[in-house]
Amino acid sequence: MGRICPVNSRARRLRARPGRPSGDSLPYHQLQGGAPRLWSPDPGRPAAYRRAHVCDVTAPRWGSTSRQGEGAVLQRMLRRRAPPSWSRDHAYSRRGWENVALFLNRKRKQEGTENTSICCRPESALACGGNLSPQFLKKVIQIQTQELW
């Protein structure tokens, strides 16, 4: 499974060390685990033994990194339903792009601008959602002057 963000193995090794230099607050991916860390059998491990997949760019997710300790008691609504996992790494697969395209098409249909291609008939200008691109106008002029290509 190709990872989206580059994995920094050194950082991961450092993160796996038992001693936590900055206070005793765990990394946020452990705080947001299945149960607050009081319930987990070993407080050094996340309650559900899994890692949330997040790139380092998105790290301070619900609060700034400096206030990490409060992440253990998140509001129920903010907690994500299921953890993103490598099995769901299909965001950039072909299927993912198709889903995005379908969704955008639906959205465009609701806005009434679904047909953005160069139309072949001038009267379909309204079907284009008033999308009068230069190519479209050129085509209209060609049709009107019957100079087809």
Swiss-Prot record:
Residues 1-41 are annotated as: Disordered. This is Down syndrome critical region protein 9. It comes from Pan troglodytes.
